[in-house]
């Protein structure tokens, strides 16, 4: 009896304090986790099936994302693909172009609706981050991309002389901005992607000398950090037509981290979605590869990976069928490495020549 009375008293006290908190800070200020309307984190596709798989479904909505890597590794391409996917679902996207380097033609080729894409090219880092904060607080924008953190120059640095030292200004700016923005991001459900560059630390003997710009705040606030690297140049003969890139999920708060994905980025076209599909279909056993030949249900469909991609491109219904089967296999728990290295260079080219002869 004493236990029941004690429990009843605690429950009354809990109800009173919860009501008091809601009166003081508004409804929803505190809740039981089981009552939350969004238990499962919704995701945005990156345009690359292998990367979506490595991320546990895609980029999480309502979170801070950091994409970093060397120059020309595909950072902006991945971000633009995410924008295109959001727009396909009827969402509103914004691009804060601090580098003043956005190519509308390339963005359009990737599927971005440039007519409805909100673009800002601010002069200072403070202006850029204030614009981001206002967009996020509006709850009207679904995704904001900042390109890049390195280009968010503090106002004091712009107004000062060229040789002036401004130690830690950008790091303090990022730390303050993220403290303000993060809470609003969670409430609005807006995804904020920061593109970042790499720098070399001086005097490092052990470990990697590489570091990202803007201090450590972004590393802590980001739910997902993607390290993207170019590992191979794709060629047809002597002509270069794209890059093979490897993405390591350096941090992931919503799925297992440290997974690796590889995919092709074609110059002028973006991520090769069909290339990703061929890789995953092969790994899940839907497409069988013997030597250079790809077969489906015992029938040869193409010789070489490039021709397999071309075959799927020419037959969209078959491509959709393969995609559906791949998703079904993955939903059933099929284990894939998500990082098949494309063998689409010399071997395929030689075999294509033999076939023509």
Swiss-Prot record:
InterPro entries xrefs:
AAA+_ATPase, DNA_recomb/repair_RecA, DNA_recomb/repair_RecA_CS, P-loop_NTPase, RecA-like_C, RecA-like_N, RecA_ATP-bd, RecA_C_sf
Instruction: Please give the Gene Ontology molecular function terms for this protein.
Output: ATP binding; ATP hydrolysis activity; ATP-dependent DNA damage sensor activity; damaged DNA binding; single-stranded DNA binding
Q: Biological process (GO) annotations?
A: DNA recombination; DNA repair; SOS response
Q: Can you tell me where the transmembrane regions are?
A: none
- Annotated Gene Ontology cellular component terms: cytosol
Region (Disordered) residue spans? 337-357
Record's Pfam families? RecA, RecA_C
Q: What SUPFAM superfamilies does the database record attribute to this sequence?
A: P-loop containing nucleoside triphosphate hydrolases, RecA protein, C-terminal domain
Q: Does the keyword ATP-binding apply?
A: yes
Q: Which residues bind ATP?
A: 69-76
**Subcellular localization, per the record?**
Cytoplasm
Keywords (alphabetical) are:
ATP-binding, Cytoplasm, DNA damage, DNA recombination, DNA repair, DNA-binding, Nucleotide-binding, SOS response
Question: Which branch of life, at top level?
Answer: Bacteria
Claim: Cytoplasm is one of the keywords in the record: yes
Q: Which PROSITE patterns match?
A: RECA_1, RECA_2, RECA_3
Acidic residues compositional bias: what residue ranges? 346-357
The record describes the protein's role as:
Can catalyze the hydrolysis of ATP in the presence of single-stranded DNA, the ATP-dependent uptake of single-stranded DNA by duplex DNA, and the ATP-dependent hybridization of homologous single-stranded DNAs. It interacts with LexA causing its activation and leading to its autocatalytic cleavage.
For this chain, the family text in UniProt reads:
Belongs to the RecA family.
Protein name (record)? Protein RecA
